[in-house]
Amino acid sequence: MAACSRRGNSLVVLAIVLLGCLSALSNAKEEATKLGTVIGIDLGTTYSCVGVYKNGHVEIIANDQGNRITPSWVAFTDNERLIGEAAKNLAAVNPERTIFDVKRLIGRKFEDKEVQRDMKLVPYKIVSKDGKPYIQVKIKDGEVKVFSPEEISAMILTKMKETAEAFLGKTIKDAVVTVPAYFNDAQRQATKDAGVIAGLNVARIINEPTAAAIAYGLDKKGGEKNILVFDLGGGTFDVSILTIDNGVFEVLATNGDTHLGGEDFDQRIMEYFIKLIKKKHGKDISKDNRALGKLRREAERAKRSLSSQHQVRVEIESLFDGTDFSEPLTRARFEELNNDLFRKTMGPVKKAMDDAGLQKNQIDEIVLVGGSTRIPKVQQLLKDYFDGKEPSKGVNPDEAVAYGAAVQGGILSGEGGDETKDILLLDVAPLTLGIETVGGVMTKFIPRNTVIPTKKSQVFTTYQDQQTTVSIQVFEGERSLTKDCRNLGKFDLTGIPPAPRGTPQIEVTFEVDANGILNVKAEDKGTGKAEKITITNDKGRLSQEEIERMVREAEEFAEEDKKVKEKIDARNALETYVYNMKNQINDKDKLADKLESDEKEKIETATKEALEWLDDNQSAEKEDYDEKLKEVEAVCNPIITAVYQRSGGAPGGGASEEEDDSHDEL
């Protein structure tokens, strides 16, 4: 590193890049004119949720299974791609092709210790590509494909987008997507890229605890309040301390751990039972993906039950070698297994309190967010830390983040109305940003918890005589040496006129907009020459070409999904019609007593042949099912019409019944 900046006449090194932190002034009327309805998506490690601001309030939207949260799981079978419940339900029988916890990979490097640890715990294959973790999976017809974490996240975002579109009855292009407050620059940008691949304009990235604070404070009037948001989800943990004052949400401090959550608690339960099975049965199931899939499902179920019960029995049929598994698990044992992890959550709470400069008695409300905050021991630790203060039960921990994101969406689209017009978000950069100076020192430029949007300038000069280029290394982190911080990349400033060291004055300006997007401009004060600086691609971002390719592939998958659904619908239509016919000709209240014997025989023959054909043609195409339906209708409909005409009723029994019963079968 050969650059120095200067205050007065002294040389100092400089530079910086700003973290894609998130949210901003909400009165964005100029944005509202360009945006349609903006949905809010909580893209979670284990579950995702979508909401929309509509008719003066937030609607959290249920998926096609009727659930308001959707598992962040994707699975591939020989015939189709599954997302959500359908994928998770297949995990035990299709482990190597079922992908989950991808949020723990997004924006990370392959050699990150968290990635290396997770590789040993998941049944699917994680491989290195361009220094990033990719997921290798067999899709169909034996074809093996690698997906970036962004692509898998995009599939989940697409599911949430389609859920909203089904509810609203229109195409959605714009979304607010949430990220953990402690996500770094690369993780934020990767999340935004996932939105692009899903066909979404990510109008804003906002921090999860800030979104939850909006959900809590939207209808809170009156004086200033300090709130602490404790957000412990499936895979990540955040603590944010905010001041709320009549619609102004100002983040004072944030802290967290992007690799701590419910999945880790499940893993401890699994490890306990794996050891128990080895001890009792002499069987090691740690490499048996099917057994682990079943155990993972039951570990999560047991953990949830222990939030309201003191003991559960974990029972799994034929877990290994045809052996059934049945063991008790007490809440006390569960707490003992996870004691260190539960206590680990208190560290960020203390740091955030110190950074905010608040005493415990100055926190007015504690807001719990994320499913893992239902764990009694976690609540007890928090209560003890705050000298007996009870946490607020005012928000739904599963839905609060999507709720706040939907409010922000309503503001950006202009659909929020009077209820949201006074809301102002002042969020912060969670990590210190700085540059490397001589000796590998981390020179801080933007301290953590700086309110964004922000704009900072600094004057550079040269370190050597006749130097025409300055190389600037940018880092994020809290340590004093850059080797202990995360390298965000570097940029070169070229074309400096040759001069003695310390002579040139180059002003570099770092500006972060409301989306947390960084613009860097450099100007030679001597010549007036200015140029934009682009951070190099060191931080593992997808290139524009890669994103465009992934968008195309996502569209191809969507087209395939559509064809699969059309095929299923066509098969269901045929089955429904055939069974309706069978029921009608055997039901005395319908057609049984009105048919001539030869008419009944014709219908019975046609329906029997159709059912046999269905059994023999499981993988037929949509057109085949449509054609078969026409054949059966050609036999049955004229008979039904004749019967109704004979009895003086309106024709159409079969057809109208089909219309009545044409709902998708579960």
From Swiss-Prot:
PROSITE patterns: ER_TARGET, HSP70_1, HSP70_2, HSP70_3. InterPro entries: ATPase_NBD, BIP_NBD, Heat_shock_70_CS, HSP70_C_sf, HSP70_peptide-bd_sf, Hsp_70_fam. Residues 644-666 are annotated as: Disordered. One of its GO terms (molecular function) is protein folding chaperone. One of its GO terms (biological process) is ERAD pathway. It comes from the Eukaryota. Residues 1-28 form the signal peptide. A motif (Prevents secretion from ER) lies at residues 663-666. One of its GO terms (cellular component) is nucleus. It is found in: Endoplasmic reticulum lumen. Residues 656-666 have a biased composition (Acidic residues). SUPFAM superfamilies: Actin-like ATPase domain (SSF53067), Heat shock protein 70kD (HSP70), C-terminal subdomain (SSF100934), Heat shock protein 70kD (HSP70), peptide-binding domain (SSF100920). Keywords: ATP-binding, Endoplasmic reticulum, Glycoprotein, Nucleotide-binding, Signal. Pfam families: HSP70 (PF00012). Glycans are attached at N617. Probably plays a role in facilitating the assembly of multimeric protein complexes inside the ER. Belongs to the heat shock protein 70 family. This is Luminal-binding protein. It comes from Solanum lycopersicum (Tomato).
